[in-house]
């Protein structure tokens, strides 16, 4: 019975899919992760998802985008208490689904190949959902409970309206000539040997860090706010840090799960 319930949760978890992924934002994180998988973890991933591994393309992301199963367009939310600990909620929650999917990956010999593939895909998708601040719902922070629009002022073309859910992805997407592979390599060079330190601690430690940074942004950003362009540019390093930390954390999770 436990196995049936777990499979149901995993299948629900993989509902957030292509439209929820930024073309380069999440892809760059996954490409970065593939660069830091152990030989055993990489072999496991290739065995689960196919034989067409291409060093120049994010393998996991490529398989994810090319999958033909009908998925919903929903995005999974991360629910946190005021102290940034995980909130126990009924129904869908990104962290809950991620932890349960990881359990299947760790115990993959006990499950069918279908169950393991579903779990692996869920891990990838849910990690990308969690690091987007627009998906972080924090008790006591009302503006974190849903998407909203705000205005950026001070640009050459006058005020522009943006959605909070695309706030971080807009930094990478702004540089249209740079591929996701370029961004992953850029993060690799920038962080160097220090990169995996972004994955220090437990998964829940990482989630709390995401929550803390999200709370800081929500404290000053709200619906219909006029954000000066200079301030928006000040957030750019934070956006890149979130992408990089997601890639390194994803690699650490898979390396730990597949020993």
Regions found by a protein language model. Name each.
Residues 4-14:
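Sec-dependent N-terminal signal peptides
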Residues 19-126, 133-259:
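N-terminal, motif-rich segments that launch catalysis or mediate targeting to/interaction with membranes
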